[in-house]
Amino acid sequence: GTLGTNPEELIAAALVGCFNMKLSFVLNEANFNPDKLDTDALITFEDGKILSIDLNLKGKVPKISADKFVEFANEAKNDCPISSALNCVISVTASLV
């Protein structure tokens, strides 16, 4: 067999893409224009089930406070359509670089 992507990796990629798009939209609506949003996802998979997905976000957004950035990141996580479709715990850790 050849190496390939598994379904869990595709779910993680879909969540990261959706989350970044939603966060970019939320930031732009609040007049913050991100220079960079870099998000990784870590899936906890046990007994054939995705138990949780931890998003690790590093962003560069001029003129935003760290608290406001975390607030917007949580809003994006909660309102992202992919997050809403998944039946697992999703957390986000957001930091400015």
Predicted regions and their residues:
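Extended beta-strand/beta-hairpin segments
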Residues: 1-13, 20-97
